[in-house]
Amino acid sequence: LNLQEQLQIHLSEIARERDPFLATAGHFFVQEYIRQQFSQWGSVEIHTFKVNGKSCKNLILNLSADGKHQDLPPILMGAHYDAVPGTPGADDNATGVAVLLELARKFATAPAKYPLRLVAFDMEEYGLLGSAEYAALLHQQQQPLRLMISLEMLGYCNSIPGSQNYPSPLEKFYPNTGDFIALIGNLRTIRDLISLSRSIRKVGVPSQWLPVPNRGLIVRQTRLSDHAPFWDLGYPAIMVTDTAFLRNPHYHQPSDNIASLDLDFLTGVCQGLEQGIRRLS
């Protein structure tokens, strides 16, 4: 199977009602699917945390680096697997999880220079709870990270001029066509933003990058994913996103289905990220 077909299979398994409270069967199904996929490449660590007495789970796969680089700080890549009630959540965030699962395959079979830690986060839609718990745990363990990358909605693309919105005043600096993938990072990540963007453009997907100071507090929309708790604890972190509701009219709607996605775009994003992560110095 080629990459696009693999991504399509993941999407068809993950895109379903899976709110942790109102669609418990779907939520458990997706959790198990991720666990099974990860377990092909190594032992899966489960990070359990409680929310209102409910046990929630982040799923973690550690992949070692190529031979001589085992001691380097890991690159953490995360994607949330929960969804809001009433939507199959194809773009939000089956796309991010599908790419996470394929990057697991790529880097398990051909390791990167850095060790990788792949994390499927729970409870993002309830206030970034899974990533906040995990970031706090790493911080407490004094675990350094080379970079944290949050995969947040990677599959919606619209090449009609005027299809892309921005929080003001960003519209003055960025294109009004929603056909690019955005990389948003704290100031520590500027070199990585430039380099990852370049790798994504190389595979033919337009890419724009935005560095934000002060933990993104000025433009709050930059904080709406699992990278934000890492920013707050001083880690270098980047969100990769199709910009969600600033572009995708199906955001948090029943219509956020696989048919609304652009699979060529999603596949390109996945390829570009793989190449980009391999090129990080």
Annotated model-derived regions:
Residues D66-P74:
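Proline/glycine-enriched tight loop/beta-turn segments at coil->beta junctions
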Residues H10-P20, A79, Y174-D179, Q253-P254:
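Acidic/histidine-rich, surface-exposed loop or edge segments in extracytoplasmic proteins
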Residues G162, Y166-S281:
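Active-site-adjacent substrate-binding region
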Residues P73-P85:
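Glycine/charged-rich beta-loop-alpha catalytic/anionic-binding loops adjacent to active sites
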Residues V84-I194, V219-T222:
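Acidic/histidine-rich catalytic neighborhood of metal-dependent amide-processing enzymes
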Residues L7-D66, L210-P211:
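A non-catalytic alpha/beta surface segment that caps or lines the substrate-entry region
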Residues I60, I75-G78, R117-A120, R146-L151, ...:
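Structural recognition of the beta-strand scaffold that forms the well-ordered cores
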Residues N2, Q6-I9, E13, A25, ...:
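Extracytoplasmic/secreted proteins, especially bacterial periplasmic and envelope-associated proteins
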